[in-house]
Amino acid sequence: GLLETTLGRASRDGRAHLFTVFGEPGVGKSRLVREFCDGLEHVTVLAGRCLPYGQSITYWPVAEMVKTVAGISDSDPVEEAFAKLQACCESEAVADLLGLAAGVLEAVEQVRGQDEIAWAVHAFVEQLAEPQPVVLVFEDIHWAEDPLLDLVEHLADRVRAPLLLLC
């Protein structure tokens, strides 16, 4: 189908592709995405859910993805969570910024700008995509705050690695 073709193009071109699934509530968008992802082999699939307005956790879906890769659980003490994050990042600066974005460390946007967080996520995704293609699934993107939408757009425009952004 179209999703498979788009992922194939991302893999062949070695660059990011953005794919948005539109439809009325209850029409089966989530099921379509889940079935597509379940059928993938030799692809890293990470998913994160955007929270409803008022939750004010801008990068929550990114945090879920980063925690999955690093093997961080919500019960981990901060020191242990950050050690796991550092172990899976090639750069300490990337680990620091992802720690902020993931809420492992305190004070995200006040201390670090959106551009810095975008740079860190970009570097992290390119590192992840070195061995095999990556699919990032942003669930409930209609709840996303502007900085997250800007980040998705940044990744779509600038990542030079086999990446499918699925919203």
Where are the model-predicted features located?
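Key residue(s) within conserved catalytic/signature motifs
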Residues: 1-167
